[in-house]
Amino acid sequence: MPRLSEAEIAEQLAQRPDWSLENNEIVRTFRLANFPAAIAFVTHVAFLAEAAGHHPDIDIRYNRVRLALTTHDAGGLTEKDFALAAAIDEIMG
């Protein structure tokens, strides 16, 4: 899958305002009710990621979960990253 251009990334980010661009990754931090809720959320993300064959970097800090997406094989952001971001956003409603 080809890397997205800067213009394509900006267009995609406009549709995902809760995500931001940091060092060739898109990132979002989620705040959950408590630690068990954070783990349940991460488990749901894990199943989505496995089904997509695309896995985020995950950082859990009590009730906060930071997700970072990039396509390592492409050396940057691709449609895969934004498709998974959209699926993750759907979980949160």
UniProtKB/Swiss-Prot annotation:
Presence of keyword Phosphoprotein: no
Family: Belongs to the pterin-4-alpha-carbinolamine dehydratase family.
Enzyme Commission no: 4.2.1.96
A GO molecular-function annotation: 4-alpha-hydroxytetrahydrobiopterin dehydratase activity
Coiled-coil portions: none
Originating species: Chloroflexus aurantiacus (strain ATCC 29366 / DSM 635 / J-10-fl)
Highest taxon of the lineage: Bacteria
Catalytic activity: (4aS,6R)-4a-hydroxy-L-erythro-5,6,7,8-tetrahydrobiopterin = (6R)-L-erythro-6,7-dihydrobiopterin + H2O
UniProt-recorded name of the protein: Putative pterin-4-alpha-carbinolamine dehydratase
UniProt entry tagged with the keyword GTP-binding: no
UniProt entry keywords in alphabetical sequence: Lyase
SUPFAM superfamilies in UniProt: PCD-like
GO BP terms, alphabetized: tetrahydrobiopterin biosynthetic process
Primary enzyme class: lyase
